[in-house]
């Protein structure tokens, strides 16, 4: 942690969150932001809270203690990481129907979900020949890294997951009543909600990785690690390597897809303008706009470097 001034905290909790308390917490957090260098994204809904915040350690501690006053702290899932730089520009607080959008209102993860499996037990579970492993993240996240032999539902967003379950899950099960279903995601929230969906549909033996990939990478030594590649994250770092340091991926600012060092060497790649994923998605006029935007970004970087040197 030496030299790393920013504490990055991912958190979520499923619990009944009353509307008046939602706005009360939001206002208190905005007051903290006004007086401190607090950034991140928080989502509030009647089903709970979800998000990631970034600030100096003492500020994060204040925020977490405040959030615990509104939640059942026993069910508040927290994952901590550190960075030399801010990973968000500012604090955004959004109030939505769901803290992670699935679009199935009849499920209730705070009352009915699968069995948590901690990092120590995960390897044994997924090596079991009677277990199928499902990555509940989006296809572009999975392209950056995933667990060995896991199933990719190839979804563009989490709201497509229920349809994948209806259309495809049974084709992966030899026996619906006896096969273990192990699910995982970045920090635990999507796979937890996915287990609630499957239980509602009558599936049995449903498990999810407690704390998600990030907790697993923090807990498991590299020589025992079954995760392959890097872990996509929704901030400026883009992806984290297996030591939870900033990885090798960047973002195509035209389409938002994660791109590797190898991707940037492809002939289709033009920084800030296009990559091989989106070369056919945009018009020439779009690319001209992207080119002007990239020129402005480059000019600002040069100017900022001059200011910092002075």
From Swiss-Prot:
Source organism superkingdom: Bacteria
Domain Rhodanese: 127-225
Any one GO BP annotation for this protein: tRNA modification
CDD domains, A to Z: RHOD_YceA
Keywords, comma-separated and alphabetical: Oxidoreductase, tRNA processing
UniProt cross-references to PROSITE patterns, sorted A to Z: RHODANESE_3
Record's keyword annotation contains Oxidoreductase: yes
Active site: 185 (cysteine persulfide intermediate)
Function: Catalyzes oxygen-dependent 5-hydroxyuridine (ho5U) modification at position 34 in tRNAs.
This protein's name: tRNA uridine(34) hydroxylase
Native species: Prochlorococcus marinus (strain AS9601)
Native organism taxonomy: Bacteria, Bacillati, Cyanobacteriota, Cyanophyceae, Synechococcales
